[in-house]
Amino acid sequence: MEPNVVEIATPPAASCSRIRTPTKAETPEVIDVEEYDLQNGGVPNGNNVDYKNKGKAIDFDSMSYGDYGEEDEYAVGSPGDDYGYPESSPLSNSLLDPESLIYEDDENYSEQYDFEMEAEPDNYSMYQDLFDGKDIPTGVEVSMDWFPNSADKESASSSKSSHANNGNNSSKKATKASGIHSQFSSDMETPVAQPWNALPHKAEGVIPNSAYALPQNSKAFQPPYAVHYSALKTAFSNYLQPQTPDTVLGEAPAPAAGSSGLLPPNTPGFKSNAARFKEEPPILPPDDSRVKRNMEDYLGLYLFFKRFDIVEDFSDHHYASKGTTSKQHSKDWAKRIQDEWRILEKDLPEMIFVRAYESRMDLLRAVIIGAQGTPYHDGLFFFDIFFPDTYPSTPPIVHYHSGGLRINPNLYNCGKVCLSLLGTWSGNQREKWIPNTSTMLQVLVSIQGLILNQKPYFNEPGYERSAGSAHGESTSKAYSENTFILSLKTMVYTMRRPPKYFEDFAYGHFFSCAHDVLKACNAYRNGATPGYLVKGAPDVEENSAGMSSLKFRTDVATFVETVLLKEFILLGVLGLEPEEEEKTPETIIVAESSKCTRSRSKRDRVSSS
């Protein structure tokens, strides 16, 4: 059946940069409807191609979509179709467009299309003139796409759109990669590089050989903060004190002169070390939403707090991520851990409390109460322990809850515990971990006796030789003064954020010892030295250690009045507020009976149950 045809007058010729010479006489054309649509950007059905695309079509090879046969054709338009060949609009086609720099001969045009074309201009000369007019810097190369966009690259010089011809595969110049790229050309546009006029070449402030030519005065190159070594050193000294001389601990490395510029100034969470220590101190500002605690909520649980117990939730443990609950350990390893539990449950000293985890036998948590006569008196010091798979051939791993404070040469502010028994410090063979002989109980007792002692300054190797000398004792006293201030801060840190399963113990402990701590601070404010035995100790005038420094006395008084006293009041400690001066004798008895000198028989009875 003959297709329906319509006789249409020839439309006026559109302006074009090149003139086509039809192969037939200029007579009214008789075309079908599909041919008419073709002239307006439609799909060609034969060898004819729409006039908008300058008589060029793209040949798809065998790697085109599998849904179409070799004779199927489809086309996609693009905004680039509105422009003519580069002469019509010099900026319409970017010089960085990879399709605009493909030079191929045009000798087969007359064979592929049904109309004749005038002689094509010399592509090389045309683009050479175009490049010369753009004032491109010497040595700059135009980026080229690795995978060509089509089989006949000369067809993409102006339109950036893809049209299929009648499936003629006569051209063998297209690579297989071109077919791969053509599959996706109908779904997305080929990315076009940034035009040269948008790049600030030959401008001041541009970094030479920069990939993106960012000006040096751009905000991206400005340091996010000003770092001064003096300020950084002061910030570290405030939070890492006390410290032994630099010959032992080493001086903190000097900060960089500025930022690398990789992060913008206002990137969330981006802080320097100095800013982190200044803005996030261990002692956080008081929370106005906190309310005064009722001692009845925790005091009873504190009095019957077991010395050793097995609990469930290990989520806040420092080494919680080192293993899983489903991990299967060897029978020998599990048996050894159970032996450690039995030893701890039976032989723990009075001032050490331990919690094990039922679902994670490799984890342990312990708290040590600071002994009287030391700068650590009445404080609580928490440690997280991890038993590796190689235990007991290798020692356990211990982390101290420092809160960012370094209270001892062997307890780093990062949480590291420096001890020969743990393999974190050198020592003779008898001081190191001995497999199948050393125990976790030895580790805890060593921390209590060797680290949290009366004169922690002499914990550093070599410093003990200065003990007894005027210089050594003077330096040790200054170190102990700083240690006690940090111990007070650790108390506040623990009261505000006690570790899980130790909340009632921490509240009850500081409730019972609050008056003793305040009494000791009053003695220190009057000149007593740290570690001075307040309970039953002689007066300050009879203290053989001499007077404490003026700075220490001032620091103690300031911290107690501004921080510590308020924390004790929020804890519910009695007798610290003016309205509590008049109390009944029964209330006084309850407060006094809950001090640190709890009944030893009651503690042992609970532990043995």
Curated annotation (Swiss-Prot):
PROSITE patterns listed in its UniProt record: UBC_2
Keyword ATP-binding: yes
Keyword set, alphabetical order: ATP-binding, Nucleotide-binding, Transferase, Ubl conjugation pathway
Gene3D superfamilies recorded: Ubiquitin Conjugating Enzyme
Tissues/organs with expression: Expressed in seeds, pistils, siliques, hypocotyls and leaves.
Compositional bias (Low complexity): 156-178
InterPro entries linked to this entry: UBQ-conjugat_E2_core, UBQ-conjugating_enzyme/RWD
Active site: C418 (glycyl thioester intermediate)
GO MF entries: ATP binding; ubiquitin conjugating enzyme activity
Keyword presence, Magnesium: no
Transmembrane stretches, start-end: none
Pathway connected to this protein: Protein modification; protein ubiquitination
Domain of life of the source: Eukaryota
Top enzyme class: transferase
Annotated region described as Disordered, given as residue ranges: 70-99, 151-185
Enzyme Commission (EC) number: 2.3.2.23
GO BP term (any one): protein ubiquitination
Catalyzed reactions per annotation: S-ubiquitinyl-[E1 ubiquitin-activating enzyme]-L-cysteine + [E2 ubiquitin-conjugating enzyme]-L-cysteine = [E1 ubiquitin-activating enzyme]-L-cysteine + S-ubiquitinyl-[E2 ubiquitin-conjugating enzyme]-L-cysteine
Segments forming domain UBC core: 332-492
Cited function: Accepts the ubiquitin from the E1 complex and catalyzes its covalent attachment to other proteins.
Family under the similarity heading: Belongs to the ubiquitin-conjugating enzyme family.
Protein name in the entry: Probable ubiquitin-conjugating enzyme E2 25
Source organism of the structure: Arabidopsis thaliana
